[in-house]
Amino acid sequence: MEISIDSLWSQVLERLQIELSRPTFETWIKTANAERLENNCLVIITPNPFARNWLQKYYITTIANVVQSILGHPVEIYITVAKGEEFEEIGGGGAWELPTTNSIYETPNQNRQPNTELNAKYVFSRFVVGANNRMAHAASLAVAESPGREFNPLFLCGGVGLGKTHLMQAIGHYRWEICPDSKIFYVSTEQFTNDLITAIRNDSMQSFREHYRAADVLLVDDIQFIEGKEYTQEEFFHTFNTLHEAGKQVVIASDRPPNQIPSLQERLCSRFSMGLIADIQAPDLETRMAILQKKSEYEKIRLPRDVIEYIATNFTSNIRELEGALTRALAYISIWGLPMTVANLAPVLVTPTEKIAATPEAILTVIADNFDISVEDLKSNSRRREISWARQIGMYLMRQHTDLSFPRIGEEFGGKDHTTVLYSCDKIAQLVESDRGLSQTLRQLSDRIKMNSRSRKPSL
């Protein structure tokens, strides 16, 4: 009896949905499609090479067995990638144009005692997937399902408030659901350093090492703060090696890629880069709206679509800022007993699209710190390549974040001519259109400038 390809694949999906866990099915199977069955070969199309490789490695036998049970005879399975969906490396937010389906994964069992370091809200079910974070989400789920097998280490990279910590802790929650006895350690780099200092002070280094090296999954947040801490880097290097050699999973999060962390030991940079570096970009409008919709659902509040659109359109930097705006809106409406309308929310939702008053001093400090040079170097007439490059980026960002004219920017950089500033700004503007790494660097520097400027703002 002949069967159409659509009917066959529908039956395959129906059976796999029962056989596999919901996260596995939603992430790896549901996004694939059967293209044709000919010459006893079933051709399956995946949205990207990442998904293809994962299916080939872990699920091709399962799929083949299900197809055989339906057709009554064995068939060869060939998995390929949809045309035009080639894998892009870091920064390729637009490369992952999968159907936007926000799978609802099971919330962790509330009866078990979780690690107190893990936020109960940071689970896969509450993470909204979009083109900006799809690769990081898929990699995190893969690690959660099979730690130590692929992507070890997994290095999550992205600006402030984009979901790195959420994904890391979701991995921890998911592992505990599968294996409650797993030793899941989530720690910030600052806490790792503090524990190390305490161990040295108390002469308990052996206990410190045994503790961290006993982890089944080690989740380390904000690794960029390891810069300049030589002894911390030394200890983390050996901890990393011990876990990796034992097949244990290491997940690291940072606001920048390993090769952009100043004063990071080369051997650590090499190890951080040996797995998968998954970049998370700022969410697009559709994803921001989905985030607001999901958060309102968890808060059991119905938001008018125009309110969602207004908040999503005006709060664009990161998820933390977006959710903060929603929280302020809900509090304001609740306190004053007003209808939920854009007009009523206008007084409390002062949009951050206004240019933050970044000072030239703050920008110079951030640039100097990032490129490991001094502010005096930036203001000097040195033509050394690294100083000249940092100076050009600084001029470009000062133009972006202040209202200073080209001559005034030149003055801030030690009295440079306005034509020098103009040339630098034009050069960086042209390069950023084709250099994804530079674009990411500029975003990260802009985030730091904004944070630096906020911290310098006097209290009212």
Curated annotation (Swiss-Prot):
Record region (Domain IV, binds dsDNA): 334-460
Main location: cytoplasm
Keyword Coiled coil (UniProt): no
Subcellular location: Cytoplasm
SUPFAM superfamilies (alphabetical): P-loop containing nucleoside triphosphate hydrolases, TrpR-like
GO MF terms held by the record: ATP binding; ATP hydrolysis activity; DNA replication origin binding; lipid binding
Protein residues bound to ATP: G161, G163, K164, T165
One GO process term, biological-process aspect: DNA replication initiation
GO CC annotations, alphabetized: cytoplasm; plasma membrane
Subunit record text: Oligomerizes as a right-handed, spiral filament on DNA at oriC.
Family named by the database record: Belongs to the DnaA family.
Function statement: Plays an essential role in the initiation and regulation of chromosomal replication. ATP-DnaA binds to the origin of replication (oriC) to initiate formation of the DNA replication initiation complex once per cell cycle. Binds the DnaA box (a 9 base pair repeat at the origin) and separates the double-stranded (ds)DNA. Forms a right-handed helical filament on oriC DNA; dsDNA binds to the exterior of the filament while single-stranded (ss)DNA is stabiized in the filament's interior.
UniProt remark on domains: Domain I is involved in oligomerization and binding regulators, domain II is flexibile and of varying length in different bacteria, domain III forms the AAA+ region, while domain IV binds dsDNA.
NCBIfam families: DnaA (TIGR00362)
Protein's name in the database: Chromosomal replication initiator protein DnaA
Lineage: Bacteria, Bacillati, Cyanobacteriota, Cyanophyceae, Nostocales
